[in-house]
Amino acid sequence: VNEQKNLGDASVINNGLLTISTERSWAMTHSISGSGDVTKLGTGILTLNNDSAAYQGTTDIVGGEIAFGSDSAINMASQHINIHNSGVMSGNVTTAGDVNVMPGGTLRVAKTTIGGNLENGGTVQMNSEGGKPGNVLTVNGNYTGNNGLMTFNATLGGDNSPTDKMNVKGDTQGNTRVRVDNIGGVGAQTVNGIELIEVGGNSAGNFALTTGTVEAGAYVYTLAKGKGNDEKNWYLTSKWDGVTPPDTPDPINNPPVVDPEGPSVYRPEAGSYISNIAAANSLFSHRLHDRLGEPQYIDSLHSQGSASSMWMRHVGGHERSRAGDGQLNTQANRYVLQLGGDLAQWSSNAQDRWHLGVMAGYANQHSNTQSNRVGYKSDGRISGYSAGLYATWYQNDANKTGAYVDSWALYNWFDNSVSSDNRSADDYDSRGVTASVEGGYTFEAGTFSGSEETLNTWYVQPQAQITWMGVKDSDHTRKDGTRIETEGDGNVQTRLGVKTYLNSHHQRDDGKQREFQPYIEANWINNSKVYAVKMNGQTVGREGARNLGEVRTGVEAKVNNNLSLWGNVGVQLGDKGYSDTQGMLGVKYSW
């Protein structure tokens, strides 16, 4: 039949076949009974009730959909149901016999009971699109996975989180791919986990998440078997099972097992957010001699007026850090370009010297965070600009000794991105001000002649610097629903150190205004705040960077009265594997 009006009450007997072909939706109210078979063709939806589902033969859904629309379960007497490619069965139904979901076929579950066995080579859709978790599929017989897909909705949180569920009274076997959609869950630590699949018989089937993991807030969930009395069942757990899932998982013969005592698992994206906010506040941070080399080489006041100058510096660096109880290992590479020049120079007493200048810069950083708990990684990117002013005062311009004070302020703006395997990229911006005050005092420690007819003057320079770091990310919500709030803006970084250097002049350079000044310095650096990210309220912070030790060595050279060069390399070391290595090259031209 292909028209509803052509079918009244029917009895399919003597192994007969009733074929219903429709391109439109039918609500079948007539009785269909007997021992024969029914085949559904066409793209339309055929809705059955208890009377029209009373036949006992085989059902073949070749096209379109057979639906059960009642609030109470419809009893389908068919002893075997085959859902073919492009076929769909849906609704609140209790079947008398077996159901076979073939490749391309779909079983949509509400409150569904399979009276016999269930084979899944297509899709068993536990979750209604965008709907609340709570659908239950009960299989009174055995379940066999033929590399089919099973989808669930769950509100990812603790053990008692709402979820769709499958309850198999018999045995499980074969391989099944699993997809879990998070519906409003903010993530939490689990103990035993969120139960998705309960097995009453022999639990030999393998179930694996299609993405290896599913995320909510700062937590990563994996699918694993239970322990003890729950060893047959399958759970979503945010506890580490000691096995790192592969990037593109397949069901495995030895599935992971929930460890209630294991540590929670954090998302690698947390490391990328932390790296980005730390970079936003530190990329353009610098010291007096980073910006100007040895300013007194060629900036000394001339009798005819003040010298004008332009400077530029290039910085490359590599940072290694950890976060999330050591789970997240981040490496970051950065590049910084800054340039500027003096607007004015003057002296208040014919001995000291004042500078006022402007500067601007461009910087970028790319970071990679690898988790030692889950099988995917995260990438962070940040790029942006800065512009601002600096001012410097020297107590004694003539003999290079005495006190100095340097200050600067910058406005910084950045574009940020965090992306990870098989997950949507998250783009956001950051804005804010950084500012610094630095002071030091230079002592002449001695003068001696070198073996190569050089005259060497040894200087020692204690230094102190306070930097306020006020760049803040925009709070926002990721496409997956995770609320992102970074922490650490407003950090006050304190640096205490000492620099010692030799000013060397060779006799052959007499009258050439050429000087050479190697140096080494050591610093202690303290950060008042920890850079961190809050993901749905769960905070993950960078480790080992509150207190740092630093060593730098470099050289400052005066080529002639107009040109000077400087460069250095430095290493910072902290706790828990934190390290930062940097190289810098600067040039200044005066006229």
Across the structure, where does each feature detected by a protein language model lie?
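Outer membrane beta-barrel translocator domains of Type V secretion systems
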Residues: P251-S451, N568-G570, D575-Q582, K588
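Transmembrane beta-barrel domains of outer membrane proteins
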Residues: N49, A67, S90, K169, ...
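Extended hydrophobic secondary-structure segments that form protein cores and membrane-embedded regions
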Residues: E195-I197, M310-W311, H355-Y362, V405-A409, ...
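Extracellular beta-solenoid/beta-roll
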Residues: N2-K5, I13-T22, A27-H30, S35-L41, ...
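Outer membrane beta-barrel transmembrane domains
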Residues: G388, G470, K479-W591
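Flexible, glycine/charged-enriched surface loops at secondary-structure junctions
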Residues: S78, S449-T454, Q507-F516
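Short secondary-structure subsegments characteristic of cysteine-rich extracellular domains
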Residues: G187-S203, G326-Q345, I484-N491
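Transmembrane beta-strand segments that form the barrel wall of outer-membrane beta-barrel proteins
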Residues: R108, N153, G184, Y411-W413, ...
